[in-house]
Amino acid sequence: MKVALGVVSPDGALITDVEQLNGKTLIVSKGTTAETFFEQNYPEVKLAKYDSYTEAYIALLDGRGDALSTDNTEVLAWAIENPGFTVGIESLGSLDTINPAVSQGNETLLNWINEEIVKLGEENFFHADYEATLRETYGENADADSLVVEGGVI
C-alpha cells in the first residue's frame, strides 16, 4: 500500500491546502512522521502534541485543534466513521509504501516475494483485493490508485 500524510478537519472549516494551517493548531501524535514533517517544513503551524492516537482523535472531536494529521490510511478510515469530518488533504509529504519484510540475508524468500508481487500485479490482484477487503474501510469516494501499489511499482 502507498502511504503519505493526510489531514482531517471538521466539515465546517475544511482544510484543503497545507497553507490554510498557518496560524492554526494542528493535532499530531508525539514521535510520529507528522510531528517531524510539520516541525521541519511548516514551523509556523502550531502543533498540539498528544501521547497516543486515541488522545489526538479525541482532541479533534473536542475542538482542541483545527485539524489532525497522521498517515492518510488512518485519517481516511477515521473520517468515514466520524460524520462531520473530512480528509481535505489526502496526500502530503513523501510517498512511502507498506511492504512485506523478510529477515536480513534471506535472499531466497526476498526474491520469491518480489517475483510473486510482479506476477500478481499482472493480474491486478492488489486492486481486486482492495475492492474485496478495504473498499468498505476507505469508502466509495476513496481512489484505490492513491493507496494501492500494483506489481511493486509506484
Indicate residue ranges for each PLM-predicted region:
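Short beta-strand-to-loop elements that line the ligand-binding cleft
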Residues: 28, 45-53
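Loop/turn elements at helix/coil->beta-strand transitions in domains of secreted/extracellular proteins
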Residues: 23-24, 43-46, 84
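Short helices/loops that flank or line small-molecule/ion binding pockets
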Residues: 19-20, 40, 54-69, 73, ...
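Periplasmic-binding protein-like
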Residues: 1-11, 34, 72, 76-134, 136-154
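Flexible hinge/capping segments at coil-to-helix
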Residues: 9-26
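Secondary-structure junction motif
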Residues: 27-41, 110, 128
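Conserved functional loop/turn residues at catalytic and ligand-binding sites
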Residues: 25, 49, 64, 124, ...
